[in-house]
């Protein structure tokens, strides 16, 4: 809140004609940055390396977008804001090659440095993809173990929204009720 977010879809519209920064270099960061150009006057993508990890097609679209500036080899050191009203007014970024720290005026900061599902507990018990997300049967929330269901951020690597998690939770509850009644 108060100008720091992990969800451009949720909070992007608060930054109409403002300057925002996105931290990250993968698909999520590039997609967030491109989405934010619908609202923000300028989007600064801050990445700690000198190359992006995002898919090549996404990188091409990003590079073609005139509203996006990429700040390479850098990391956010500090978020600077006001207390009344609470909001972001700048960040301090450190160039990881030169160690030089600069202050950059922004109105919002979006964190998109990856999402790891909290599934380590289920390793070697439930089937997972290579990123650790639980796998379910097609059009279902049922896992490889009958009576065990997956919903929300442990299964959904695309949207990661409360509303989609709630919908999946409802599906899982209905499937569990059906399983228990048979």
Predicted regions and their residues:
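Short glycine-/acidic-enriched loop or helix-start segments at secondary-structure transitions
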Residues: 16, 32-33, 55, 120-122, ...
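Glycine-rich dinucleotide-binding loop and its adjacent helix/turn
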Residues: 1-39, 136-138
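Cofactor-binding loop segments of dinucleotide-utilizing enzymes, especially the Rossmann-like FAD-
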Residues: 9, 25, 48-50, 153
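Residues at secondary-structure transition points
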Residues: 2, 27, 53, 159-160
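A conserved FAD-binding loop/helix module that cradles the flavin
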Residues: 30-34, 145, 151-182
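Hydrophobic/aromatic beta-strand patches that form the interior of the parallel beta-sheet core
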Residues: 5, 21, 44-46, 71, ...
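Short, well-ordered coil/turn residues at beta-beta hairpins
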Residues: 23, 112-113, 144, 151
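A Rossmann-like FAD-binding core segment of flavoenzymes
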Residues: 38-138, 145, 178-182
């Amino acid at each position: 809140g108060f100008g720091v977010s992990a969800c451009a879809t949720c909070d992007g519209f608060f930054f109409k004609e403002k300057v925002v920064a996105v931290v990250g270099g993968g698909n999520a960061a590039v997609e967030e940055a491109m989405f934010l150009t619908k609202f923000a006057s300028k989007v600064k993508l801050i990445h700690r390396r000198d190359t992006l990890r995002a898919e090549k097609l996404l990188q091409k679209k990003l590079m073609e977008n005139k509203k996006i500036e990429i700040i390479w080899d850098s990391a956010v050191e500090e978020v600077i804001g006001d207390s009344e009203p609470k909001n972001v007014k700048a960040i301090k970024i450190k160039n990881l090659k030169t160690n030089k720290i600069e202050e950059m005026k922004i109105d919002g900061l979006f964190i998109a440095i990856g999402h790891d599902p909290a599934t380590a507990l289920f390793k070697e018990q439930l089937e997972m993809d290579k990123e650790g997300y639980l796998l379910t049967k097609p059009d279902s929330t049922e896992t490889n173990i009958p009576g065990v269901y997956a919903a929300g951020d442990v299964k959904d690597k695309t949207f990661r929204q409360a509303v989609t998690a709630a919908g999946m939770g409802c599906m899982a509850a209905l499937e569990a009720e059906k399983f228990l009644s048979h």
